[in-house]
């Protein structure tokens, strides 16, 4: 029954009344689908008929074709403008085009002005000859005037011919010679006037051409300047947006890295509590320092004692003090040794300068690193070679653990733990860079020998 309804696209009202609301909606949906299907079939059939008609039409023969010109090497002949010695520069070509356009514009203006003057003169002469005649009378007398003028012209031509014939037949007199000389002088004066007028006209034309050329040239320069300034502004805007985006991404990455590293440090048991627990067992008691007599230095010593974190050197501390500090406090902790304490790590270096560390890293390339005893503080410096150059990071060794200088940094029990950790986890300040290749000692040189003696 449904097929019959869809084929006829009709349902009896009594039968429709017996259907539920849901069945009615389904039936209406099916009928709409059938309408769309029939319409699509009709569209496809019309398209096929149109294609058949289009293909059946005879095509016009096209005789046009393109032939490439070939050079002596049997390749397509190519001419790059500006490379040949006889080619004009681009700026000169542009100037010539502008000058030609300005000349044409000036000639056009001069022609329009000349036509305007001719029209004004003709109107003025008409008014002088016929001051009381109206337009209708002038129109009626036009044919008559043309006939009269034609008759006068024919009569004058006949008179001139007769005079010429008489001049040829009769011998020339003194009066004729004087008349001819006078006519010649008049003709020469007329020619001079015409030449002067032409020169003035040419001068005006050249001045107008130069004026138009300068105006167009100035407009073109202003346009080029505005385009250049707009490009520079767009470029600066793009760079500033990139810089802002880079700063935001770096800040976000630093926050994410810190959260991730903190969680990993907690999971690995390398947080400060674990470091303190094991440090209390391994670290021997520090011998008491001798009491100094009260002096002006007490104030500076008290300030250093009160200050937490990394200890900086004052003017009284030198290389010997650093060596003494290392032997008394760091050597018992096996700082710079492997976890078992059997050998010194290849990345460990003694008291070397920043320049010496950069020279060592430069010979090993990107990804190399070393850890050296600082020559300025009682601590260490991690030097790393990246694509942008060498970076140096201070390591705080004032507490019972080791960490990079700053707040909320992960703390490690030993230097070896710190290095091993950052072989798999990047330093936040470096982005995604890892400690990959340890940079060892120079051949035949051991820069930490004075620390182990």
UniProtKB/Swiss-Prot annotation:
Disulfide bonds: none annotated. The keyword Coiled coil applies. GO terms for molecular function: phosphatase binding. Transmembrane segments: none annotated. Residues 347-439 form the SH2 domain. Signal peptide: none annotated. Residues 280-301 are annotated as: Disordered. InterPro entries: SH2, SH2_dom_sf. Residues 96-127 form a coiled coil. GO terms for cellular component: cytoplasm. It is found in: Cytoplasm. Residues 284-293 have a biased composition (Pro residues). Keywords: Coiled coil, Cytoplasm, SH2 domain. Inhibits estrogen-induced cell proliferation. This is SH2 domain-containing protein 4A. It comes from Xenopus tropicalis. The gene is sh2d4a.
